[in-house]
Amino acid sequence: MKLVKPKKNLGQHFLTDLSIARQIADTVDVCPDIPVLEIGPGMGVLTQYLVEKPREVKAVEIDSESVAFLYEKFPKLRENILGQDFLRMDLNEVFDGRQFVLTGNYPYDISSQIFF
């Protein structure tokens, strides 16, 4: 599996610290029955911990190279890896209007747009 290089034009900075990824995933567990949407999974470092729990996880990634990598790394998650631009998504359609937890190692370039 060929690693993906971060693309500066997308503001990518991949999470590589496994302990930080585990801590983020553990923080999401405060809402164990609510599905999770991960923004910008990159190479799936956080994703690998999110999918350990018995809950629905979806990941949205704009970079087609990262999407292909994620398909290979997480074949069972393939239908839940969304190759889209998060900022243009209709979030009501992601989980059919249900409440969900938003997490991720957000691309710096869009972090303010995500939260505001």
What label would you give each PLM region?
Residues 1-116:
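Catalytic cores of RNA-modifying enzymes
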